[in-house]
Amino acid sequence: ASGVDRRELRKLRRGQYAVGRRLDLHGFTAKPAVAATIRFIEDARQGYRCVAIVHGRGNHSAGRAVLKEDVRALLRSHRAVLAYTDAPRDDGGSGAVYVLLRNRP
């Protein structure tokens, strides 16, 4: 994650940022989930530094964890995302991500 220093990334991994908003994608299919994630990130940038996105682990998908992979691919390329990491185990673990957002210009 370029543009983020080690301390910030460590804080994010440890769940030390207050999660301002949360998006739960359970029950979504791939395209609507990606669209909802884009809207969520854009809206959250209005006043939140850290958000959580619950995409699930893909236990009910045949073959691959579609939502997990698609959401994380989006996060890798979205200009508003400074960094992201698995949520702490007690808040979804690998079935959720904490996202650190860039300050809105």
Question: In which residue ranges do the predicted regions lie?
Answer:
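Long, charged, low-complexity intrinsically disordered regions
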Residues: 1-105
